[in-house]
UniProtKB/Swiss-Prot annotation:
Organism: Mus musculus
NCBIfam families cross-referenced by the UniProt entry: GET3_arsA_TRC40 (TIGR00345)
N-acetylalanine found at: 2
Physiological role: ATPase required for the post-translational delivery of tail-anchored (TA) proteins to the endoplasmic reticulum. Recognizes and selectively binds the transmembrane domain of TA proteins in the cytosol. This complex then targets to the endoplasmic reticulum by membrane-bound receptors GET1/WRB and CAMLG/GET2, where the tail-anchored protein is released for insertion. This process is regulated by ATP binding and hydrolysis. ATP binding drives the homodimer towards the closed dimer state, facilitating recognition of newly synthesized TA membrane proteins.
Keyword vocabulary terms for this entry: Acetylation, ATP-binding, Cytoplasm, Endoplasmic reticulum, Hydrolase, Metal-binding, Nucleotide-binding, Nucleus, Transport, Zinc
Name of protein: ATPase GET3
Catalytic activity: ATP + H2O = ADP + phosphate + H(+)
Subunit relationships: Homodimer. Component of the Golgi to ER traffic (GET) complex, which is composed of GET1/WRB, CAMLG/GET2 and GET3/TRC40. Within the complex, CAMLG and GET1 form a heterotetramer which is stabilized by phosphatidylinositol binding and which binds to the GET3 homodimer. Interacts with CAMLG (via N-terminus). GET3 shows a higher affinity for CAMLG than for GET1. Interacts with SERP1 and SEC61B. Interacts with GET4.
EC number(s) recorded for this UniProt protein: 3.6.4.-
Gene expressing this chain: Get3
Residues that, per the record, bind ATP: 45-46, 49-52, 251, 278, 319, 321
Record flagged with keyword Iron: no
GO terms under cellular component: endoplasmic reticulum membrane; GET complex; nucleolus; nucleoplasm
Annotated CDD domains: ArsA
Pfam families: ArsA_ATPase (PF02374)
């Protein structure tokens, strides 16, 4: 159409196309194809299949990237179960892959988690533990945040092409994304109270794995870490380098949690434009099942709501399977569903 609209110089067909927005492709192909991505977070409510999805994503990424690392920050450490292989705090090659590595960390273990028996030998040490706990409470989250900071420093030095985070349930995830702010705030608070806690600072540093140092040395170490932390923080807020994939199931509580998570991610300025809806029931017309049909109707209601609410998201629909996805071969098979929409029996 050659004519513009009412002198605005805009083609009429642009307006004609506007009302009917095509739904975005229901796959994670956009993630695989965006080669600028460095950090990919996979998270959501507990029990929705985050680990299976994050491991599957890592497998697909390994087919096109030079080196891929998947990190579990969930104390449950389910990636060992998913790949049927024991992983540790050190990146370990996943069996059957040359460029896929996995590691598990538990950043939530701080001084407060140490058993009382550790301090029984000396009353002074026992008192020291209480003092350390009081000191740590002055800047909550600093031990967990410093653990994240150390992991980030190590990971950045290893130069992986892309890092996938299999995150813990929502609360831990938001702390992970906010750790740069927590460390900066904690550093300021430490400078204010370092003279008060100086007698116990060496014990506290040993508990945090920071070696034997005084308050000034600890503050200096934190200041040295800040540039790395700030760099990571900037990357987290860059949609070209970082994105968050929400995993949920088609139920009210999970949908509510997903919306809350997306709102929090927006506040943190973290990009998110992909949702995986897992464990969907697709009735088999050749094998009628009242329970399956009832479940399918409930899920369909919430799926419709999600498609209305998140029309600017890629919504990936994954089926509930009759078996566990465990072992590298099964994870690899399941991972294909991230790129090729699942076809239920009734449509095959």
């Amino acid at each position: 159409m050659a004519a513009g609209v009412a002198g605005w110089g805009v083609e009429a067909e642009e307006f004609e196309d506007a009302p009917d927005v095509e739904p975005l492709e229901p796959t994670l192909s956009n993630i695989i194809e965006q080669r600028s991505l460095k950090w990919i977070f996979v998270g959501g409510k507990g029990g929705v299949g985050k680990t299976t999805c994050s491991c599957s994503l890592a497998v697909q990424l390994s087919k096109g990237r030079e080196s891929v690392l998947i990190i579990s920050t969930d104390p449950a450490h389910n990636i060992s179960d998913a790949f049927d292989q024991k992983f540790s705090k050190v990146p370990t090659k996943v069996k059957g892959y040359d460029n896929l590595f996995a590691m598990e960390i538990d950043p939530s273990l701080g001084v407060a988690e140490l058993p009382d028996e550790f301090f029984e030998e000396d009353n002074m040490l026992s008192m020291g533990k209480k003092m350390m706990q009081e000191a740590m409470s002055a800047f909550p989250g600093i031990d967990e945040a410093m653990s994240y900071a150390e992991v980030m420093r190590l990971v950045k030095g290893m130069n992986f092409s892309v890092v996938v985070f299999d995150t813990a349930p929502t609360g831990h995830t938001l702390r992970l994304l906010n750790f740069p702010t927590i460390v900066e705030r904690g550093l300021g608070r430490l400078m204010q109270i370092k003279n008060q806690i100086s007698p116990f600072i060496s014990q506290m540093c040993n508990m945090l794995g920071l070696g034997d140092m005084n308050a000034d040395q600890l503050a200096s170490k934190l200041e040295e870490t800040l540039p790395v932390i700030r760099s990571v923080s900037e990357q987290f807020k860059d949609p070209e380098q970082t994105t968050f994939i929400c995993v949920c199931i088609a139920e009210f509580l999970s949908l509510y949690e997903t919306e809350r998570l997306i709102q929090e991610l927006a506040k943190c300025k973290i990009d998110t434009h992909n949702i995986i809806v897992n464990q969907l029931v697709f009735p088999d017309p050749e094998k009628p099942c009242k329970m399956c049909e009832a479940r399918h109707k409930i899920q369909a209601k919430y799926l419709d709501q999600m498609e209305d609410l998140y029309e600017d998201f890629h919504i990936v629909k994954l089926p509930l399977l009759p078996h566990e996805v465990r072992g590298a071969d099964k994870v690899n098979t399941f991972s294909a569903l991230l790129l090729e929409p699942y076809k239920p029996p009734s449509t095959q």
